Amino acid sequence: MTTITLPPPNARYQFSILPEIFKQGLPDTDADTFDYAKENFGLIPRAYPSDGTMEDVESKTPWQRFEHYVKTLNGNAEEGTEYKVLYLGRHGQGYHNVAESRYGTKLWDDYWARQEGDEHAHWADAHLTEIGEQQARDVNTFWRTALADAKVPAPETYYTSPFYRCLQTASLSFSSLDLPADRPFVPVVKELLRETNGVHTCDRRGASSIIRKDFPMYVLEKGLPETDVSWTPDRRETPVEHILREHVLLEQVFAEDEHEFISFTAHSGTIAAVLGAVGHRRFALPTGGVIPIVVKGEKLIR
């Protein structure tokens, strides 16, 4: 069990989850069997305090009423308080996931994760398998229906981990969608969204020049070095360190991004750390899984 006191002493923000919005946040929802695509993304059917201020509310979908609620919360929020909806997506199956299943987690952690690959595949900065590509296309299919029918708000900003499997997943998930003109798919590559750092070669970033070459429409955040200077072969980031790293990421997003609906394409460990940073219950995602959350950010006075 990871024990951590949040916010950390040097924090600029305190984060919390807006409860009773999504089924994934309820204690009796089983992450192993829950299918977000069959459950309206997990949105709990309910009335909102803002329903009375919405024109033609009876004709609106639950997601349209929820979107109005979020905008109302932000419109009435005290100075320094803001609400953001985060769509947290895990990459599709990568070659490293297949290798861990082949060898078992203990042998993977003890030996194979430190190697570049085996006779079956190369997994340093792992790419998606064919199954992983299809999982990402399944996310695209979900979004296509969700946008058109349920009226789920499209992300206004897209952030992705710099690892190749996430760059692929983001592209396959979003690039072919009929998105609103003011919400184009122009993802920003953020280093802080990387997987738990160190030791595992699958979690060592490839060259930034490869990202520019293979994903020319992606925007690399300022200062991303050509090579992965933070990865080390002999020390793995701890769960507490990872939660603190994602707390910094959230501080950046809340301080610098004015948008309310934001997509993160990342990793199992990273999403777990984001959930930990905002006080959400543990909710493990399968490869290709997505979970929405509403985060309340309160700026701290130091």
Where are these regions (language model features)?
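Short, solvent-exposed loop/turn segments at secondary-structure junctions
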Residues: 92-95, 163-166, 193-195, 229, ...
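Short aromatic-enriched loop/helix-cap "lid" or pocket-rim segments at secondary-structure transitions
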Residues: 97-102, 199-203, 277
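Regulatory modules of eukaryotic transcription factors, especially in plants
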Residues: 232-240, 271
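Domain-level recognition of soluble alpha/beta enzyme cores
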Residues: 279-302
